[in-house]
């Protein structure tokens, strides 16, 4: 990956050093159009030897050091939060019966106290990386635990977590401690020394690939047509655009098209000197918005920290030069960097040029091979076909960010006793701490295998496991993603072969989305609709809740037969026909046509509607009494409407209690919405303080256990209770959400089936 012209050159003082030692200037390069545009001449890449010399050109270390410091700081902040140190005991509690999803089944978590030690090593490595203290060792101390934790749980994989591991891997081989580091204070050889150009080239190439491949993946028809993030435009951040655009056009033009153009162009805008200021403005605005739109941890800030890598490497020195002199004494050096053995210096023809050594050739080879590998991996799914589902590959290294949104309407897990034939149902997600397994065949296979090991403890022998999972991707019909007739315990799965029990995504039905949106918009606010598509030969068994007093099914395409189980009646529906479904009963919908059937459930939650009407009446009555238009005195059971709480007297009705709880909740939301900035900031900081406080205390407890042994259970319980305290938060504040908020204690497997109403 090349660098821009200004980025490739050293600062003025550094140029002087090179001229004194090498006896040549870069005047010719400055005069060449290619040199000005790309930072190198064609002759610099005309042979392997010249390319090695180019990639090892001495470059100012200042910008690289600033990125090292900021990236290390982001990782220090990330470990207690998104890496899960604050909730580690909930995820890896010893003896917890839970199904896990590592990349390799042989990869298992260590005992809890040892997991805290792993995280401690990772934290110290990130801290050492940030400070540039024993830099190479610190990078390794961070890198190895990070990838161990990352590979331990596929359900937590995402693009930015993968990117962190890549950046740490790159920094391990770089000389990022040659400026603004503790190592530089301890070693004169490392203090303010040149770094080879490939250090910048690899990082810039990585960030360029992230932007550009993300843009290429957004050329998907769903993104271009505005289906991927359809509801994102409702966020308050897009309010300014709605002064001139409708919400639909804001979603299409601003969210989707502008997002596509930004990803495709960001790398180029940052690369070239003439457009860099515009690129910095756009990507900074983009990542600041993302920090508010999504819960993606440190990712926006890491990307913000990476943007200055595209600027001239000496920009920190220029910044320091504009600071007050007293402050300059505390800031990094402004003097020109000293020569380094890691670089190749050009000399005069009389003296002969410096010949690149093995380390220089290895650095150049690493740069080329690494960037080629990063360009290949997002399109390598033809090799790992077992991980392909409706989208290609495990979510992470493909850079297909936000392209696919899913909704799950119905999930049913059925088990059959292999000896007795007895059928039973499991709560979806039992024995798990994540929901991502529903979309990935490899995780489903791991989940079924785990359940087959756990169910014999509950008197289910030789269990067979069947999954009926309905998913809608990017506003399509809800449809099955896996064949519900296949026992996943015995089903074959290979990482290198297509999954035979994966159902195809019904792409032929995608044009229906416009019609489906028209149907939705034609319904009133109290009517809900769910669109279903099913395969020939399969049927859907569903239960209509008693709360849904007005439920009907209407056929859109194909032919279905509806069986009312309790009444033992069948009715066949042709296209356009509909029928009423009784509440509180099961029914089955069989697809009879040779092609997939499409139908929709239309229903009204009559119980919820009646409650809303009653609450609206109480609100109206309260307002009438307060403004004096209601002359009749309120009965005693309704007095809490005026007081806002129960103060003696008769017990209010459940309806009044529900009204009071809603009023209190609305008042709290309004109070928070109108809270001054300093109050919001304080609440945010206190929640973060709790996360770091709990992380620190639980780590101390575990390290003590490893060194001195575990105390009594009573003492441990007291220590954990103390770690869970929130002494800094005001009374009544809700608990902050943890990294993993799922229930660590799964339900019993013989619980009643959970039926999701359509």
Curated annotation (Swiss-Prot):
Q: State which ranges are Lumenal (membrane side).
A: 82-113, 158-292, 383-758
Q: Which domain of life is it from?
A: Eukaryota
The cross-references to SMART domains, in alphabetical order and at most eight, read:
HTTM
The record's subcellular locations are: Endoplasmic reticulum membrane
What family does this belong to?
A: Belongs to the vitamin K-dependent gamma-carboxylase family.
Enzyme Commission numbers on file = 4.1.1.90
InterPro entries for the chain: HTTM-like, HTTM_dom, RmlC_Cupin_sf, VKG_COase, VKGC_lumenal_dom
Q: Which reaction is the catalytic activity of this chain?
A: 4-carboxy-L-glutamyl-[protein] + 2,3-epoxyphylloquinone + H2O + H(+) = phylloquinol + L-glutamyl-[protein] + CO2 + O2
Which residues get modified to N-acetylalanine?
2
Subunit annotation: Monomer. May interact with CALU.
Any other comment in the entry?
Answer: The vitamin K-dependent protein substrates of carboxylase have usually a propeptide that binds to a high-affinity site on the carboxylase. CO(2), O(2) and reduced vitamin K are cosubstrates.
What Pfam families does the record point to? HTTM, VKGC_lumenal_dom
Broad class of enzyme this protein falls into: lyase
Which cysteines bridge via disulfide bonds?
Answer: 99-450
Print the keywords alphabetically: Acetylation, Disulfide bond, Endoplasmic reticulum, Lyase, Membrane, Transmembrane, Transmembrane helix
Q: Which organism is the protein's source? A: Delphinapterus leucas
Q: Which residues cross the membrane?
A: 61-81, 114-134, 137-157, 293-313, 362-382
State the protein's name. Vitamin K-dependent gamma-carboxylase
Compositional bias (Basic and acidic residues) at which positions? 12-22
Task: Output the Gene Ontology cellular-component terms.
Answer: endoplasmic reticulum lumen; endoplasmic reticulum membrane
Please give the biological process terms from Gene Ontology that the record holds. negative regulation of bone development; negative regulation of neurotransmitter secretion; negative regulation of testosterone biosynthetic process; protein maturation; vitamin K metabolic process
Q: What does the record give as the function of this protein?
A: Mediates the vitamin K-dependent carboxylation of glutamate residues to calcium-binding gamma-carboxyglutamate (Gla) residues with the concomitant conversion of the reduced hydroquinone form of vitamin K to vitamin K epoxide. Catalyzes gamma-carboxylation of various proteins, such as blood coagulation factors (F2, F7, F9 and F10), osteocalcin (BGLAP) or matrix Gla protein (MGP).
Q: How does it sit in the membrane?
A: Multi-pass membrane protein
Q: Which residues lie on this side of the membrane: Cytoplasmic?
A: 2-60, 135-136, 314-361
Q: Per the record, where are the segments of Low complexity compositional bias?
A: 734-750
